Amino acid sequence: MLYLASRSPRRQELLQRLDVPFQTLQLDVPELRAADESPDQYVQRVALEKAHAGLALVQAADPDAIVLGSDTEVVLGERVFGKPVDVDDAVAMLRALSGRTHQVLTAVVLVCAQRAPAQALVVSEVTFDTLDDAQIAAYAACGEPMGKAGAYAIQGRAERFIRHLSGSYSGVMGLPLYHTSQLLTAFGAH
């Protein structure tokens, strides 16, 4: 059985598009970046930790379990934007992204007891239009930025702010479907 180690409804929705049966695991994995950790290393480590935590949870009951872990972060320079802690934090993130190009890093990891982990790191570039204070305040107040890396949902109201995207749209949402499908096929789970 395939398990998705994620609380994200977007990842669940995206994984359903691959027509692979799976169960969702509700896990709490700390997402704290070490001082010497690059954004690439950080997102890959968190995805791997989610997958391993999920495997530890289900392996006794399902020895053939395959667990998918994923993490997405928004990066501007060396600054990593996680999920905003409140509306003011969301406003600050959106101001920083306004009129600039940032990267969205999404790591996907598959683990099981029988083989080494398989992983992919997908880097997309997103250019925001220049947003005025009223646009930022209105978007932050709508609630959509909460729980989203970088304080925006590309598939939601923020889509109108995206001037250019290079990379994986589904990766920016939280699960790059092409790369995930390739990993599942390599693992014999698709």
Swiss-Prot record:
Q: Carries keyword Hydrolase?
A: yes
Tell me which InterPro entries the record gives.
Answer: ITPase-like_fam (IPR029001), Maf-like (IPR003697)
The broad enzyme category this protein falls into is hydrolase
Where it mainly occurs, coarsely classed, is cytoplasm
A molecular-function term among this protein's GO annotations: dTTP diphosphatase activity
Has the keyword Protein transport been applied to this entry?
Answer: no
The positions flagged as active site in the entry are D71
Tell me which cofactor or cofactors this protein depends on: a divalent metal cation
Alphabetized, the UniProt keywords read: Cytoplasm, Hydrolase, Nucleotide metabolism
User: What is the E.C. number?
Assistant: 3.6.1.9
Q: Reaction catalysed by this chain? A: dTTP + H2O = dTMP + diphosphate + H(+); UTP + H2O = UMP + diphosphate + H(+)
Matching HAMAP family: Maf
Q: What family classification does the UniProt entry report for this protein?
A: Belongs to the Maf family. YhdE subfamily.
Q: What does this protein do?
A: Nucleoside triphosphate pyrophosphatase that hydrolyzes dTTP and UTP. May have a dual role in cell division arrest and in preventing the incorporation of modified nucleotides into cellular nucleic acids.
What is the name attached to this protein's record?
Answer: dTTP/UTP pyrophosphatase
Q: What is the lineage of its organism?
A: Bacteria, Pseudomonadati, Pseudomonadota, Gammaproteobacteria, Lysobacterales
